[in-house]
Amino acid sequence: MEYLGNTELLNVPKTAFLASSTIQPDMVLKCYDWATQMAKERQCVVSGFSSHLESEVLHFLAKGKQPIILVLAREMYKQIPAELQPLLDDNRLLIISVSKAVRQSKATARSRNKYICEMADKILFVGVTEKSSLYQLKEEFKEKSIKYE
């Protein structure tokens, strides 16, 4: 495991955001509202930010002031994406790499998502059905699961 950024974020309460790759359109705006609310409340959000919706939520969170933990299912960035550099500079981002793989795979994503669930105090699962790769985690960590209406 490799860390870059503010490791003190490991000690604060964290809410995980995990979204299926297939989302109903009505859920998208709700997730944007949720991200805006988390930013206003300065709640730490942890995610892989790899699905389309997760990456969109990261854009909303990046505009706020709350801490963010980004967990990669691949090796650490060789070059930090431009959007993330100001967050590192402001000491409100922690990037964690949980794999030495060059690219994310289904296996490394599963491992990353489980790690996120284990570290989070609460988890918002979005668009998860029985066919979703996140379904097993949603069942395993249902005591941490929250809803956003």
Residue ranges of each PLM-predicted region?
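Glycine-biased, small-residue-rich flexible motifs in mid-sequence functional cores and linkers
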Residues: 1-149
